Amino acid sequence: MTTALDQLKQYTTVVADTGDFQQLAQYQPQDATTNPSLILKAVQKDAYKPILEKTVRDHRNESTDFIIDRLLIAFGTEILKLIPGRVSTEVDARLSFDTPRSIDKGRELIKLYEAAGIGRERILIKLASTWEGIRAAEVLQKEGIKCNMTLLFSLVQAAACAEAGAQLISPFVGRIYDWYKKQAGAEWNEEKDGGANDPGVQSVRRIYTYYKTFGYNTEVMGASFRTTSQITELAGCDLLTISPDLLQKLQDSNDTVTRKLSPDALQDKPAARVAIDEAAFRFQLNDDAMATEKLAEGIRVFAADAVKLEKLIDSLR
């Protein structure tokens, strides 16, 4: 019998969301994504400590920032040995409001990959979907450096990313779901408010429809899933990046997966494009409490994990 994972792959490019690259082979994803939290989690496992220790040993006299960049490339390089497609490597979240330094970091990471013999067509540079991050992506894209816009929670962010020519966006399904569920409290009803009505699922569906309606080439990759239901409700989305735990659940399931999103069957098409000059962007983002709070929280969490990784590296010198 065909597994739910195999059925999903008929409609959507499946991406593995992990730094634990030893798990990749069993799920055969096309691409992989990493972030500071996933790398921090991976290097604390016995299987990956040798990569961390070797990177620190080889560059002991260099700055911690220098070592972290090499560690990211070491993980990305190993991941690319196991997948046919692309890996996403994230720019330090502490640069989320600094366009020039985000551009410099993106260029630097690509140079390191190319020095390791990996072409830029296999790399996506992850940037936070702040106004400053989007402007950095606009510059990098024109240089042939493809960008994955992360921490995306709203249509205005998605619209701005598309106008900037970003290669790909990662709307965060699960974190949107978390916010609305917390706000609802005891009134939340999973049967009524989940599934196709899940606010995270609806957000991605709205963004997907917007992009296809207006002919944007930016890829939509749903991310940050809590349940397999959220994933299967988005079957047909350009890409979905999924944690190993949920990939395993899909592989263990024989439930029928049907296509839910298609450029040929768009529903509730928008009438007009979103206004996305800087003032309009900032106002619309500010007007969306969920997106504002989750973007700020996401940057804080990734920045905190970057600091933890720095401390771990410094302890090994």
From Swiss-Prot:
GO terms for molecular function: transaldolase activity. GO terms for cellular component: cytoplasm. Pathway: Carbohydrate degradation; pentose phosphate pathway; D-glyceraldehyde 3-phosphate and beta-D-fructose 6-phosphate from D-ribose 5-phosphate and D-xylulose 5-phosphate (non-oxidative stage): step 2/3. Coiled coil: none annotated. SUPFAM superfamilies: Aldolase (SSF51569). Belongs to the transaldolase family. Type 1 subfamily. Transaldolase is important for the balance of metabolites in the pentose-phosphate pathway. Homodimer. PANTHER family: TRANSALDOLASE. This is Transaldolase. The lineage of its organism: Bacteria, Pseudomonadati, Pseudomonadota, Betaproteobacteria, Burkholderiales.
